[in-house]
Amino acid sequence: MKFELNDKKLDAIKADFELVFIQDKNLKIFNKEKDFFKLNNYKGEGALLDLNNKKLYLELKSLAYEDIRLSLCTAYKTLEKLNIKSVKLPSIIGDCVVRSFASLVEGVLFGAYKFDKYKSEKKTSTLEKFIISNEELNGKKFNKDEAKIGLERGEILANATNFTKNIVNEIPEIYTPLKMAEDAQNLAKENKNIICKIYDEKFLAKEKMNAFLAVNHASVHPPRLIHLSYKAKNAKKRVVFVGKGLTYDSGGLSLKPADFMLTMKADKSGAAAAMGIIKAVAELALDLEVHCILGATENMIGGNAYKPDDVLISREGVSIEVRNTDAEGRLVLADCLSFAQDLKPDLLIDMATLTGACVVGLGEFTSAIMGNNEELQNDFYLSSKKSGEYTTILHFNPHLRELIKSNIADVSNTASSRYGGAITAGLFLDKFIRKEYKDKWLHLDIAGPAYTEKSWGYSSFGAGGAGVRMCVNYLIQILRKAK
């Protein structure tokens, strides 16, 4: 898909179709179209095609970035069925030129996303170009250089998000830990500024990553610890992302019910998001040093599977009582967080589809933010709102911390109560964060929006690419504050 900024007024631009935006359901200004609207009972909601005049009338609820994304997604999905190549539209400017143009591109590319590699009949579209006039929707003037930055940023962010979706949507037969390692290596080959290191099970044993290794015991596919890194010449901060990469989770001996096992290919969403983030960071050439530590494994059943009642000694030296083998992601993250802290980060963020409790509490569309530093949590939350991803803060408290105490080890991998499960999982991870990094750490539970078995907003069925846009947006904010 191409996005072209054109200096001409909208009427002077040649294209196969035109987008006409309707704000606040205000149809009074459309005198010529009055009869056409009445004939089609159109009241300014949704979309209306005028095939004779080659126009698509499109609701734009506001100039908020999310509404821009939703409108452009609707535009693409409506027009992709037609035999056209180009569309023209006015510029849509909200509070920020860069963000507005980025949102426009994101809406189109999210609308165009499909995971159809296993379909025998694939639907293709001839639509290949969006031509954006410098004539602004409300007659305002804007900086063209900022518009170009926005178009580029939107394309990079959307492509990185869709890259993440492809990883999450891929089937478990194909997508093993070795495949994740291969994708990480290919990512480094495609971008000379990204370095990739892959570590095998012998390295994990040497590093005493026993919790990580235990999860992998019953799988025929060996685990991999993946380290991706990017470093700008004038890096302002060192940021480390840790991603849960369960390429499939059966629950282990604490076997999931059949219905719950469906969609567990998506348990690699945290690692996939981290890969999408570093891809975007490198393409945007952000002045940062960014590392991604990914724990890739399966959690399967077998005669050599780890068991409830086991006690594991983690890389941090913290002993863990296993009371449920389906609480495996936190075991992998515990050792990966330990490894990540050796990199001495200024900011440490882990991402995981960690708990069903998070989905029960927040719904399918919202990720949870947790940590010890309220200012950091609030900054991230406010930044995430601008990215288009939904988040909320879940606060730690000492009473929930009591629930993960163990009588035979330093900590239990599940709580003694089923209530507050998202927070007790976060508190478990906090047990492995060293004192000097307590205030530099954020835990993101992306279990809801990482994968949904329905389309919503501009997200298609399946993977949502959760985590990519909100984290990259926060990194951009960090750099803005550093100036």
UniProtKB/Swiss-Prot annotation:
Catalytic reaction list: Release of an N-terminal amino acid, Xaa-|-Yaa-, in which Xaa is preferably Leu, but may be other amino acids including Pro although not Arg or Lys, and Yaa may be Pro. Amino acid amides and methyl esters are also readily hydrolyzed, but rates on arylamides are exceedingly low; Release of an N-terminal amino acid, preferentially leucine, but not glutamic or aspartic acids
Entry keyword rRNA-binding: no
Residue sites binding Mn(2+) 2 per the record: K244, D249, D267, E328
GO CC annotation, single: cytoplasm
Pfam family, one: Peptidase_M17
Family: Belongs to the peptidase M17 family.
Name this protein carries in UniProt: Probable cytosol aminopeptidase
Taxonomic path: Bacteria, Pseudomonadati, Campylobacterota, Epsilonproteobacteria, Campylobacterales
